[in-house]
């Protein structure tokens, strides 16, 4: 089986572990995009601590789960999102207003849609978490 997306596989593993009630999950392979995505999730309290383990290959990440996550996923292909269109994407992807985050990759780094609106930057849509 070929991997379609490393980020999609990682978020799928987190979703499955959260649904089965696990306290932690091992993600491999690792990438910088996964680490930044996890940092945004951690900042908003959807996951606990996570630790990067360098195994001199592609690396592993051990994520501590805290039971707050309902769902996270990847948007593929990574559509370009203008600042004015962010509101439409949040309405389409998230279950309610003021609930969950759409995560974008911008020229200023990977961030959630609220931070992107504050910094007045647009970019490509990576995924969502709620």
UniProtKB/Swiss-Prot annotation:
Q: How does it assemble?
A: Component of the small ribosomal subunit (SSU). Mature yeast ribosomes consist of a small (40S) and a large (60S) subunit. The 40S small subunit contains 1 molecule of ribosomal RNA (18S rRNA) and 33 different proteins (encoded by 57 genes). The large 60S subunit contains 3 rRNA molecules (25S, 5.8S and 5S rRNA) and 46 different proteins (encoded by 81 genes).
Q: What are the GO cellular component annotations? A: cytosol; cytosolic small ribosomal subunit
Q: What is its main location?
A: cytoplasm
Which NCBIfam families does this entry report, sorted A to Z? PRK04034.1
Could you tell me which PROSITE patterns the record lists for this protein?
Answer: RIBOSOMAL_S8 (PS00053)
InterPro entries associated with the record: Ribosomal_uS8 (IPR000630), Ribosomal_uS8_CS (IPR047863), Ribosomal_uS8_sf (IPR035987)
Q: What does this protein do?
A: Component of the ribosome, a large ribonucleoprotein complex responsible for the synthesis of proteins in the cell. The small ribosomal subunit (SSU) binds messenger RNAs (mRNAs) and translates the encoded message by selecting cognate aminoacyl-transfer RNA (tRNA) molecules. The large subunit (LSU) contains the ribosomal catalytic site termed the peptidyl transferase center (PTC), which catalyzes the formation of peptide bonds, thereby polymerizing the amino acids delivered by tRNAs into a polypeptide chain.
**What is the protein name stated in its UniProt record?**
Small ribosomal subunit protein uS8A
What keywords does the record list, in alphabetical order? Cytoplasm, Ribonucleoprotein, Ribosomal protein
> PANTHER family annotated for this entry?
40S RIBOSOMAL PROTEIN S15A (PTHR11758)
Q: Name one GO molecular function term.
A: structural constituent of ribosome
Q: Which HAMAP family match?
A: Ribosomal_uS8_A
Family in the record: Belongs to the universal ribosomal protein uS8 family.
Localization per Swiss-Prot or TrEMBL: Cytoplasm
Q: Name one GO biological process term.
A: cytoplasmic translation
Q: What else is known?
A: Present with 40400 molecules/cell in log phase SD medium. There are 2 genes for uS8 in yeast.
